[in-house]
Amino acid sequence: MAGGAGSRLDMGEKPLVKVSGKPMLQYVAEAFIGAGCDILIITSHLVPMTKNWCRAMGYDTYNASGTGYVEDLFECIRETSLKGPVFSCVSDLPGITADIISEVFETYRSKGKPAFSVWVPEEYFIEAGCTPSYVEDVESCPACPVGLNIIDASMADDAQDEYRFLFRKPELAYNVNCKKDFESFLKFIERDKLGL
């Protein structure tokens, strides 16, 4: 998902903001490709440079209306006739890896529910110096969604029973929405040597 304006970060089009010399969107795209997924990047009129970058990289795109995250996702599902399990992921999650995606999908398959969301403990956000947008108890733990989900596209027009997965992966707490988040993630890379 790369169609939002990303105005809070104030560093140009957010998907193209570079971490260690590479756009954040590229980390996300390469992680999904590395996990064996076909990717379709949802863009909009709000991110013309991102659309051009995707074209240059050879990534397939869908140009949505730019109304909002959920609206653009479901517009894409309807217009492209996607079926079966579909990942959605924010473009500003540079700590994501192919191994994380593979583990998430295996857990999704084991739970037997059509919808699946990934959460990490709130304490990870606090330790990271990032501000969570939403907190709810998951498995008796205050937790925050990370922007990585799976839905059954075949049931896109229906309410879907959701499994909330508490995933203890600190790197997923870095959903880069503002300069403070960005700076915190750079420090995390240095401290934990993710190899980005």
Where do the PLM segments sit?
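Hydrophobic packing residues within well-ordered alpha-helices of enzyme cores
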Residues: 9, 50-54, 76, 104, ...
